[in-house]
Amino acid sequence: MFIFSLSMSISPGPVNLTILTSSMNYGVKATFAFISGATIGFTLLLASVCFGLYQMIVIYPVLLDVITILGTVLLLWIGLNILRAKGTVISSQPHDEAKIPTFIQGALMQWLNPKAWIAAVAGTGLFSTGHIHAVLLVFVAIYFVVCYLSLLLWGIAGEKLASFLNTGNRARLFNIVMGVLLILISLEMCWRYFYH
């Protein structure tokens, strides 16, 4: 359970790239609400899938289509915002609060993130033991802790990266690369879902 949770949480994805970029631009402290929202949002998604939502998806598979489309739109929007970011690194100057990702955006991003749904459905299938819900409760608890720590590590990495990117146009170039990557990841996940 720990290895599965770690491999899914620490591997690059839309949420991780958003945390990396936000922490580079605004610091971990400013990004912490987004990290918390993403962790709690995913934990609620995982618990919902573990304890019944999976059956609803089996009955109404079109729900995954809707989630994939909405998720792609959300990820494209976030990617465009990162792409257009000025490329400033952490400073003592006041931040533009409107550009710092919020708790709600973190939670919503997980519910609309195809990678999160894949992790939730795969983990539920892997660790489900029939009618013994205690195993799934342990899985959800382990995933919560591992997810929080993994996302926090991405935030710390972004903050550390800021010192390297504080020269010339490196921060702006980094935002362009991260924005383009997030856009490409979201389009690729949508493409793979509909045309695999």
What are the residue ranges of the model-derived segments?
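Hydrophobic alpha-helical transmembrane segments in multi-pass integral membrane proteins
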Residues: A47-C50, W111-V121, V180-H196
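Juxtamembrane transmembrane-helix termini in multi-pass membrane transport proteins
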Residues: M1-D65, A122-F139
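Hydrophobic/aromatic residues within the transmembrane alpha-helices of Major Facilitator Superfamily
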Residues: L6, I10, L44, L80, ...
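Membrane helix-loop-helix hairpins that form the core translocation module of multi-pass transporters
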Residues: K29-T102, A157, L187
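Selective transmembrane alpha-helices of multi-pass membrane proteins
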Residues: I59-T88, C147-S150, W154, A162-H196
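Residue-level signature of transmembrane alpha-helical cores of multipass secondary-active transporters
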Residues: M1, S5, A38, G106-Q110, ...
